[in-house]
Amino acid sequence: MSQLKVDNGPLSHVANSGPISIGAYCFSSIMMTVTNKFVVNLKGFNMNFVMLFVQAAVCVNLLFFLRLLGYAKFRPLNRTDAKNWFPITIFLVLMIYTSSKSLQYLAVPIYTIFKNLTIILIAYGEVLFFGGSVTAMELSSFLLMVLSSVVATLGDQQALKKTADAGASLFNIGYMWMFINCLSSAAFVLVMRKRIKLTNFKDFDTMFYNNILSMPVLLALSFLMEDWSTENLTKNLSRDSVTAMIISGMTAVCISYCSGWCVRVTSSTTYSMVGALNKLPIALSGLIFFDAPKNFLSIFSIFLGFLSGIVYAVAKQKKQQNPQPSAPIK
């Protein structure tokens, strides 16, 4: 069993504070996106698999440290669970690699907006494979998500036209990586849902197995597909890039921990709304820290993406309060 340790000591007022847990969750999410973007934006960076391996290694070591302190409990690695969970690892590696590649080529606001499309794929995947349903309000949020993505693309194209040379292609390969990422992310979530029932994993079990099983896969792919020459390693593994990778790996654990913390001290309803509202500061961080397009269409797409997240969160809450099955939309 994996679980969070509840602090009953002198700092219990902090451990049981809703606003602090929400703030910690939002800060961790922003930090992870910003540090990942910083690394992949470094001049000549081309070792995404190594970056992901370092992050996974940091996650595993931090989990062991938290278990030593008594703040996390998770199952030890065993052959049966590893065999059952390994198919998930393949989807995970595909998901995080395509995520890093899309973030490398797309601005943070556009990346954040397009990630919403994964929600649509997951929702209809649940309709197809688990007998779920899509309500009218959820469908409305999906339409807003698609609209925000279209507007974001137009804003990006508008910005490219101003900076690109005459006759240069305006196609951004980041959109291809984003499309693959949405598909692989949805597949990862849907397959993991089935496997969790098989293994009965909890949050920290899932994080531990995801990271420790992905490490050899990431390292093998790096050796096969990336340049391990001394010159390239020196260029990619600078002090700044490695520091950012370590911070990113630590924030991944923080996000998982803060998610459970937020649900414990507030409610699942509050947490789902925070997740929707959190899209805005993540998108804005791209405008503040990086050279993201700053035209009307780009700003408007952020607003639409933010609105779609709120509508979706409210729709999910209403669905939980009124669990009668509605007719599946196919």
Swiss-Prot record:
Task: Output the superkingdom of the source species.
Answer: Eukaryota
What is the membrane topology noted in the UniProt record heading this document?
A: Multi-pass membrane protein
Keywords for the protein's UniProt record, in alphabetical order: Cytoplasmic vesicle, Endoplasmic reticulum, Golgi apparatus, Membrane, Sugar transport, Transmembrane, Transmembrane helix, Transport
Q: Is Transmembrane among the key words of this record?
A: yes
Q: Which GO terms describe its biological process?
A: transmembrane transport
Spans through the membrane: 14-34, 49-69, 82-98, 105-124, 139-155, 171-191, 204-224, 242-262, 270-290, 295-315
| Endoplasmic reticulum keyword on record | yes
- The residues exposed to the Cytoplasmic compartment are 1-13, 70-81, 125-138, 192-203, 263-269, 316-330
Lumenal face residues = 35-48, 99-104, 156-170, 225-241, 291-294
Compartments where found: Golgi apparatus membrane; Cytoplasmic vesicle membrane; Endoplasmic reticulum membrane
Supply the InterPro entries for this chain: SCL35B1-4/HUT1, TPT_transporter
Q: One Pfam family, short name please? A: UAA
| GO cellular-component term (any) | Golgi membrane
Q: What does this protein do?
A: Involved in the import of GDP-mannose from the cytoplasm into the Golgi lumen.
What family classification does the UniProt entry report for this protein?
Belongs to the TPT transporter family. SLC35D subfamily.
Oligomer status and interactors: Homooligomer.
The name this protein goes by in its record:
GDP-mannose transporter
Q: Which gene encodes it?
A: VRG4
